[in-house]
């Protein structure tokens, strides 16, 4: 049984506190899946057509990859394309990333400062992935503490890609699918 205790917006997402009456092993499985197996979007492929800034292409691509992208992937091969074209002097922010099929979770993340005459022109693609592959796909941090026998209190902090309840629901679905798959494999062994 899940009891929601608190939910509040923060500057980087949400804080979500709930208690769960379940064995510790089950609670830990949910926590691990929330962090490492719930799919989210992150910028993976960056095409730099022009970069006369003082930042190396590789660092610029890395910074773009760490910007949280809103949305829950519906298809495995779904792609969100962003473009960025800016000329200095200015600071380039995540809000400068333009897309017809997606959006960044936070508009105020600085990417690079451009001096007079400096320019960047970039196209990048956000694809679905999981935190087990790279931390840029982690939708949250999750910890818990035991408050009674077979009862824990979770503290979940999201990064803006998805709502906390949505992350929890996805984690439960993933765990259910894993359990069903395991049972099917056991049945095949018994035959």
Swiss-Prot record:
Its main location: cytoplasm. This is DNA-directed RNA polymerase subunit Rpo3. It is found in: Cytoplasm. Belongs to the archaeal Rpo3/eukaryotic RPB3 RNA polymerase subunit family. It comes from the Archaea. One of its GO terms (biological process) is DNA-templated transcription. The keyword Nucleotide-binding does not apply. Its EC number is 2.7.7.6. DNA-dependent RNA polymerase (RNAP) catalyzes the transcription of DNA into RNA using the four ribonucleoside triphosphates as substrates. It comes from Methanocaldococcus jannaschii (strain ATCC 43067 / DSM 2661 / JAL-1 / JCM 10045 / NBRC 100440). One of its GO terms (cellular component) is cytoplasm.
């Amino acid at each position: 049984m899940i009891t929601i205790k608190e939910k509040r917006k923060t500057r980087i997402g949400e804080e979500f506190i709930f208690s769960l009456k379940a064995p510790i092993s089950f609670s830990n499985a949910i926590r691990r899946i929330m962090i490492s197996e719930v799919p989210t979007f992150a910028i993976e492929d960056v095409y730099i057509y022009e970069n006369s800034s003082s930042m190396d292409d590789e660092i610029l691509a890395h910074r773009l990859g760490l910007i949280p992208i809103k949305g829950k992937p519906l298809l495995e091969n779904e792609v969100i394309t962003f473009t960025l074209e800016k000329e200095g002097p200015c600071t380039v922010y995540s809000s400068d990333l333009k897309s017809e099929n997606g959006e960044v979770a936070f508009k105020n993340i600085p990417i690079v400062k451009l001096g007079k005459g400096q320019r960047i022109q970039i196209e990048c693609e956000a694809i679905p992935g999981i935190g087990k592959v790279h931390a840029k796909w982690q939708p949250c941090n999750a910890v818990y503490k035991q408050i009674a026998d077979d009862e824990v209190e979770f503290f979940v902090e999201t990064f803006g890609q998805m709502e906390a309840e949505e992350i929890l629901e996805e984690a439960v679905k993933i765990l259910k699918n894993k359990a069903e798959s395991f049972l099917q494999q056991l049945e095949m062994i018994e035959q």
